[in-house]
Amino acid sequence: MALRFPRFSQGLAQDPTTRRIWFGIATAHDFESHDDITEERLYQNIFASHFGQLAIIFLWTSGNLFHVAWQGNFETWIQDPLHVRPIAHAIWDPHFGQPAVEAFTRGGALGPVNIAYSGVYQWWYTIGLRTNEDLYTGALFLLFLSALSLIGGWLHLQPKWKPRVSWFKNAESRLNHHLSGLFGVSSLAWTGHLVHVAIPASRGEYVRWNNFLNVLPHPQGLGPLFTGQWNLYAQNPDSSSHLFGTSQGSGTAILTLLGGFHPQTQSLWLTDMAHHHLAIAILFLIAGHMYRTNFGIGHSIKDLLEAHIPPGGRLGRGHKGLYDTINNSIHFQLGLALASLGVITSLVAQHMYSLPAYAFIAQDFTTQAALYTHHQYIAGFIMTGAFAHGAIFFIRDYNPEQNEDNVLARMLDHKEAIISHLSWASLFLGFHTLGLYVHNDVMLAFGTPEKQILIEPIFAQWIQSAHGKTSYGFDVLLSSTNGPAFNAGRSIWLPGWLNAINENSNSLFLTIGPGDFLVHHAIALGLHTTTLILVKGALDARGSKLMPDKKDFGYSFPCDGPGRGGTCDISAWDAFYLAVFWMLNTIGWVTFYWHWKHITLWQGNVSQFNESSTYLMGWLRDYLWLNSSQLINGYNPFGMNSLSVWAWMFLFGHLVWATGFMFLISWRGYWQELIETLAWAHERTPLANLIRWKDKPVALSIVQARLVGLAHFSVGYIFTYAAFLIASTSGKFG
């Protein structure tokens, strides 16, 4: 018999039903479960797949550059970044006739195009790219890197170049490479680019390979570096009247601590950012050399962890046993990496709008909204993934003997206390927040809005004031105009920072009131409940009072038969599955809040948010319904407009989302009956019955159907909101 899919599992390959296909796809990346897998092959497969991942990323970014250079309007956009709409790429085959062609011909293009809401134009402009030729060069370079990555992946699967397991488990060398090599050297290289290319470009000087060695980035060259007069590099910064991209009002400083924003571009000063990256580079270059590699000096991670036994015995044996536990578990390492990456992605979302790094991006409102929403959703998926792999670690890799009485074992020992506290926090937040919202709803419905319960977030306002926001009148710390810190801030450190906080043209320290207080607690409810489900799933993954032998059933099991009542829905996978719904729900509230507050800010009617956000009907009517009018009117008897594509995506997103429930609400028996009826009809229908299949069609397993349902729910949810967000924002602000 010829080898059938899946080749990595002979047991599955011999399955006579369609289960072979679905289980094959589901376990394709679960290398640990494949036939003949060894620890060495497992590590090598994962290592090689990283090169493939890099190749795809480089190819994708190359494509962005290539299409903008070929079909975009980068050179035109540079002339007037605030009024020309940046083009992502052309639309090859516009359907729906002449009105569609006219609706999508914009941004100075000759034919129908898509507008870019990704911020790449602003990014490329900020880092010193100026012509289509620059973009083509970048695209070719990334294509070369992509090919190099593919070759690297292939090479490291060849017998001569396969790394050994000991190489993968050398923690100190990996820290050396990642901290110094990846973070340190790349930050230093980026500082170099900013100083040698981007800052001159922002001052109207075009530095490329042909004049790179002739143009001094600073009039004094390297002199101040070697004589220790580093402050010279900060003297004569760009003035507040500087026109970005020209020499008008420009200075000569390359590394500054100005603080605040460039008045024209409303983005952070390039010289501040160069300084920041230089500091990061030095920090990481030092950090990467603190661990013991080939030279017998520096810290040993294992020794550090073994020594970490807190005094007083309150944490038992402290970190003993953790080194081997983490170093031998890929799932633990992946969980830690995903948790870190999830947090950093959410931080990117928060900082990209509040401290914009790219010239003119703060005035491109649709891009701001799209980037915030994009990064928050990505962060949600990555964070839930961290807990999923944490749970798999407990099931597959955790060794109780190795971790006796250390911090990890003690987490498991008092899991009831952890879970019940999280549960209490979630219940408290949920009932109180909903109670306030519903009370306010009823008061408005009865025509007595003055009877609403409105709570000023005084603690948060006090914290904002302490950081320098004066409008609340707290007169404390940095908002106290006669304090020493305030005066030092005017001269010694970041003189532009306090000005930026108290300007109303940016998103720093937005003024908050009772509506913010309520939605903040609604979001806190979502975060705590999501965390509760994920933490409970991981801590109960090995077993619970109800099902002490749970770990023997693996990560995802539907139930343990009818004999043990109540074992359905308690696998670690079920916890992850439920948590993703809560995660999407929570990020929904986060993005609704961010978007509505900013729409009213940009339109200059902040009072709409302040007055309507204190009761649920206000959110439904004045945010969702009011802003979806553009979508519902994307096409009408008078033809099409440029929002039509978002209107269809809005409908299509709802369709995909609703399809999810088909899989979430009806399970195997229903589908099995339906499949058998359809197969019966197929076999008795002339012509159709010429098509045969070898695999007997069977319904998806309960767990698989849930996955398919969850995937449709998630994708539909995000498609729907993306269309709503982009259409409602671009419809208002162009």
Swiss-Prot record:
Keywords: 4Fe-4S, Chlorophyll, Chloroplast, Chromophore, Electron transport, Iron, Iron-sulfur, Magnesium, Membrane, Metal-binding, Oxidoreductase, Photosynthesis, Photosystem I, Plastid, Thylakoid, Transmembrane, Transmembrane helix, Transport. It is found in: Plastid, Chloroplast thylakoid membrane. P700 is a chlorophyll a/chlorophyll a' dimer, A0 is one or more chlorophyll a, A1 is one or both phylloquinones and FX is a shared 4Fe-4S iron-sulfur center. Phylloquinone binds at residue 671. Chlorophyll a B1 binds at residue 654. GO terms for biological process: photosynthesis. It catalyses: reduced [plastocyanin] + hnu + oxidized [2Fe-2S]-[ferredoxin] = oxidized [plastocyanin] + reduced [2Fe-2S]-[ferredoxin]. Its main location: plastid. NCBIfam families: psaB (TIGR01336). This is Photosystem I P700 chlorophyll a apoprotein A2. It comes from Arabis hirsuta.
